[in-house]
Amino acid sequence: MENTLGLEIIEVVEQAAIASAKWMGKGEKNTADQVAVEAMRERMNKIYMRGRIVIGEGERDDAPMLYIGEEVGICTQPNADQLCNPDELVEIDIAVDPCEGTNLVAYGQPGSMAVLAISEKGGLFAAPDFYMKKLAAPPAAKGKVDINKSATENLKILSECLDRAIDELVVVVMKRDRHQGLIKEIRDAGARVQLISDGDVGAAISCGFAGTNIHALMGIGAAPEGVISAAAMRALGGHFQGQLIYDPEVVKTGLIGESKEANLERLSSMGINDPDKVYDAHELASGETVLFAACGITSGNLMQGVRFFHGGARTQSLVISSQSQTARFVDTIHMAGQPKTVQLH
C-alpha cells in the first residue's frame, strides 16, 4: 500500500493546503475549510483505490462532502467496473482533516495543516465526534508515561526517560478553561507550558521528533483528531493514549450532546461498550500498514506553510509510514499556468 499510495496522499494534502492558504489572514475560517475539503476530495477521486471516509467533516446530513461513510477514489465512480480490476483493488479506510486549525488560517497564525491518515479497511478507529483526553510523548517514554497518572508523575518519568531536567521540559496544552488546573499542576511541577489556541495534531506529532522542543501533549481535545495523531505516533514509535470524554460537564460544553446518559447510549449503539477504556496508538490505528500525511498551510514547528510566488507555490509536506518506519519531509514546487516569455529590447 505504501508503494502505491505514498506519493498520491502527499499530493492530496498539498492540494488541500494550497487551496486553504489562499484564504490565510482573511478572517473567513469556514471558507478556508471548505476550499480545502473540495481540493482534497477532488484529488482523492483521482487515486486508484476504493476508499471510505471513517473520520471526516461530519455525518452525511451535516457535510456535503468527505462525510463519514463517503466513498472516494477512482474505483467508487459510476464507471468503476470499466476502470478497476477487482483483483488489484485497494480498499482502505481514511481519516481526514483538510484544514486542521481553521482559526489559525483565518487569522494568519502558525501551525495549521492539511492532514490525513489511511490504513486497510478496518484499520482506523471510527471515533465519534466527542472529546478525548490525550497524552503524547516521545518514543523514549513509550509505555512508561501513562494517561492515568498525574501530570506531576508523568513529568518525573519524562525527565528520567529524556535525561532532561523537569524545568527543561515543554508541555503543549490547548488554551481552554477546562485546563486551568492542568496548567497550574504542570507549572508547579517545574515544567514549562506552551499554550495553543487550536490544532493539537501538530503538537502531538512534534513529540515524536527530536529538536522540536515539545516533549508532551496533555489535555482534552477532539477525538477524531486523536485518531489521526495516533496514526502518526504509531508510525513514529512515539507514545499516544486517548480516552473518550462523554460527560459534557467535563468540558463545559454541549457540543458532545445534551447529557452524559445520551452519550453513553450513542457509544453503546456504535459498539463501544467500555466508554472509559484507554486506547493506545495501536488500538486507534490498528491496521497492518498505516500511512500519515500532512502539509503545512501556515508555518509551524514541523513544516513551512504554503509560500506563493508568481505562477506557483512551494509546499512542505510530511509522510510517515508504519511499514517502512520512515518519516519523509517533501519540499515541492508547484508551477501553474504557462510560462511567460520575456522579450528583451
From Swiss-Prot:
<keyword id="KW-0479">Metal-binding</keyword>
<feature type="binding site">
    <location>
        <position position="131"/>
    </location>
    <ligand>
        <name>substrate</name>
    </ligand>
</feature>
<feature type="binding site">
    <location>
        <begin position="100"/>
        <end position="102"/>
    </location>
    <ligand>
        <name>substrate</name>
    </ligand>
</feature>
<dbReference type="InterPro" id="IPR004464">
    <property type="entry name" value="FBPase_class-2/SBPase"/>
</dbReference>
<feature type="binding site">
    <location>
        <begin position="198"/>
        <end position="200"/>
    </location>
    <ligand>
        <name>substrate</name>
    </ligand>
</feature>
<keyword id="KW-0113">Calvin cycle</keyword>
<keyword id="KW-0378">Hydrolase</keyword>
<dbReference type="GO" id="GO:0019253">
    <property type="term" value="P:reductive pentose-phosphate cycle"/>
</dbReference>
<protein>
    <recommendedName>
        <fullName>D-fructose 1,6-bisphosphatase class 2/sedoheptulose 1,7-bisphosphatase</fullName>
        <ecNumber>3.1.3.11</ecNumber>
        <ecNumber>3.1.3.37</ecNumber>
    </recommendedName>
</protein>
<keyword id="KW-0464">Manganese</keyword>
<feature type="binding site">
    <location>
        <begin position="176"/>
        <end position="178"/>
    </location>
    <ligand>
        <name>substrate</name>
    </ligand>
</feature>
<feature type="binding site">
    <location>
        <position position="97"/>
    </location>
    <ligand>
        <name>Mn(2+) 2</name>
    </ligand>
</feature>
<comment type="function">
    <text>Catalyzes the hydrolysis of fructose 1,6-bisphosphate (Fru 1,6-P2) and sedoheptulose 1,7-bisphosphate (Sed 1,7-P2) to fructose 6-phosphate and sedoheptulose 7-phosphate, respectively.</text>
</comment>
<dbReference type="GO" id="GO:0006094">
    <property type="term" value="P:gluconeogenesis"/>
</dbReference>
<dbReference type="GO" id="GO:0030388">
    <property type="term" value="P:fructose 1,6-bisphosphate metabolic process"/>
</dbReference>
<comment type="similarity">
    <text>Belongs to the FBPase class 2 family.</text>
</comment>
<dbReference type="GO" id="GO:0046872">
    <property type="term" value="F:metal ion binding"/>
</dbReference>
<feature type="binding site">
    <location>
        <position position="57"/>
    </location>
    <ligand>
        <name>Mn(2+) 1</name>
    </ligand>
</feature>
<feature type="binding site">
    <location>
        <position position="225"/>
    </location>
    <ligand>
        <name>Mn(2+) 2</name>
    </ligand>
</feature>
<keyword id="KW-0119">Carbohydrate metabolism</keyword>
<dbReference type="GO" id="GO:0006071">
    <property type="term" value="P:glycerol metabolic process"/>
</dbReference>
<dbReference type="GO" id="GO:0005829">
    <property type="term" value="C:cytosol"/>
</dbReference>
<feature type="binding site">
    <location>
        <position position="100"/>
    </location>
    <ligand>
        <name>Mn(2+) 2</name>
    </ligand>
</feature>
<comment type="pathway">
    <text>Carbohydrate biosynthesis; Calvin cycle.</text>
</comment>
<dbReference type="Pfam" id="PF03320">
    <property type="entry name" value="FBPase_glpX"/>
</dbReference>
<comment type="subunit">
    <text>Homotetramer.</text>
</comment>
<dbReference type="GO" id="GO:0042132">
    <property type="term" value="F:fructose 1,6-bisphosphate 1-phosphatase activity"/>
</dbReference>
<feature type="binding site">
    <location>
        <position position="33"/>
    </location>
    <ligand>
        <name>Mn(2+) 1</name>
    </ligand>
</feature>
<dbReference type="GO" id="GO:0050278">
    <property type="term" value="F:sedoheptulose-bisphosphatase activity"/>
</dbReference>
